[in-house]
Amino acid sequence: GVGFKAGVKEYKLTYYTPDYETLDTDILAAFRVTPQPGVPPEEAGAAVAAESSTGTWTTVWTDGLTNLDRYKGRCYHIEPVAGEENQYIAYVAYPLDLFEEGSVTNLFTSIVGNVFGFKALRALRLEDLRIPPAYSKTFQGPPHGIQVERDKLNKYGRPLLGCTIKPKLGLSAKNYGRAVYECLRGGLDFTKDDENVNSQPFMRWRDRFLFCVEAIYKAQSETGEIKGHYLNATAGTCEEMIKRAAFARELGAPIIMHDYLTGGFTANTSLAHYCRNHGLLLHIHRAMHAVIDRQKNHGMHFRVLAKALRLSGGDHIHSGTVVGKLEGERDITLGFVDLLRDDFIEKDRARGIYFTQFWVSIPGVLPVASGGIHVWHMPALTEIFGDDSVLQFGGGTLGHPWGNAPGAVANRVALEACVQARNEGRDLAREGNEIIRKAGKWSPELAAACEVWKEIKFEFAAVDTL
């Protein structure tokens, strides 16, 4: 019996280890596995562990030259998904040495790179990842984080207000800058480039940057508050992105923006490093996320993309509005909002959190609520998200019948009224409409906004932005 035993053998003989004790340094993954008919769940779970770590479809001679026990991924636990037929959660532990330090790109290439096309599976979804401190400490993380951002902006004790400039495509740079100025002058903290505003024929990036920064300075001098506009630096090459970021810095802009999924994690991490080194805040848009996270049984849950972003680096990230229709959605969204903001998050399956996550010293990221929200949602948003958030009203600002600046005034008055009411101990869930209506008596701008969008029912069941 010299040599090795060639041939195909079942994955579960090597990669299914139900008695494995996970190490503090292991990266842990929770996969939702839907096996093909006739494939036992243990084999499916082991196949995922194998194909996303050291395994291939057959035994190879060079297996003898490595220490499989040190390097293999292990499926250490499998449980059926309640209420779903033929779906299982497979827990996989990966040894730390399988991954390059400081590279989200390499982490994803390994864990979700190849295995999703695997024939033995009908579908596969990565639900959660546990990033151990030994790995997270190899990342810079967000350029600045929540506390440093508040200090830079000198804004405390309330959510920040933003607005995406619409129509998103077609405005000239000067008219675009005018819209920015009006919103900031009216009382918003930030305005935002839309995710697909890069550098198109109708508005080149350099012209936009100049007019927007002029708008920022004008609004700052008139209001005495620090203002910002998310200048979208996303471009076709990393070099071009850094060039745009450098120009923003030269102009004295406080914050730039990146589409991290279309731009890619490598580009995002480079940009985040540049931003920390040069004092720029970094706003992250999640364009393309639904391609990856919308299917319930295949792809990746957004909480994984959110964790990856906290490692790669960003100071703000879009995270849905939560004033959606489904109760469960709210808990799940708040689960990954906490994963973005807090240092330590306990395992809590009701909120979709499969693992206890300890971020050590990596700064927090501000969640951004945007999409179909307006002044009547303000009490719900204030209560749900708390102070550490950015509330973005695009149409809810620019759709005001009197124009952009009054739209901004309406939002700011509504927010300040909600924060004051909360600080006085009032119940925003029950008294929300009343608080907004009363504030409208002192602010004609808010009264006009209330009239346009009418009040909504306040079981927090408002707008469904899927």
From Swiss-Prot:
Subcellular location(s) of the protein: Plastid, Chloroplast
Cofactor dependence: Mg(2+)
EC top class, as a word: lyase
Cofactor note: Binds 1 Mg(2+) ion per subunit.
Lineage: Eukaryota, Viridiplantae, Streptophyta, Embryophyta, Tracheophyta
Residues annotated with N6-carboxylysine modification: K192
Record-listed Mg(2+) binding positions: K192, D194, E195
Residues of the active site: K166 (proton acceptor), H285 (proton acceptor)
Note: The basic functional RuBisCO is composed of a large chain homodimer in a 'head-to-tail' conformation. In form I RuBisCO this homodimer is arranged in a barrel-like tetramer with the small subunits forming a tetrameric 'cap' on each end of the 'barrel'.
Molecular-function annotations in GO: magnesium ion binding; monooxygenase activity; ribulose-bisphosphate carboxylase activity
Swiss-Prot/TrEMBL GO biological process terms: photorespiration; reductive pentose-phosphate cycle
Protein name: Ribulose bisphosphate carboxylase large chain
HAMAP family recorded: RuBisCO_L_type1
Natural source organism: Dionaea muscipula (Venus flytrap)
NCBIfam families: PRK04208.1 (NF003252)
One GO term describing the cellular component: chloroplast
Domain of life, per lineage: Eukaryota
Site feature Transition state stabilizer, where: K325
Pfam families: RuBisCO_large, RuBisCO_large_N
N6,N6,N6-trimethyllysine: residues bearing it: K5
Post-translational modification comment from the UniProt entry: The disulfide bond which can form in the large chain dimeric partners within the hexadecamer appears to be associated with oxidative stress and protein turnover.
SUBUNIT field: Heterohexadecamer of 8 large chains and 8 small chains; disulfide-linked. The disulfide link is formed within the large subunit homodimers.
Catalytic activity: 2 (2R)-3-phosphoglycerate + 2 H(+) = D-ribulose 1,5-bisphosphate + CO2 + H2O; D-ribulose 1,5-bisphosphate + O2 = 2-phosphoglycolate + (2R)-3-phosphoglycerate + 2 H(+)
Family per record: Belongs to the RuBisCO large chain family. Type I subfamily.
Annotated EC: 4.1.1.39
Residue sites binding substrate per the record: N114, T164, K168, R286, H318, S370
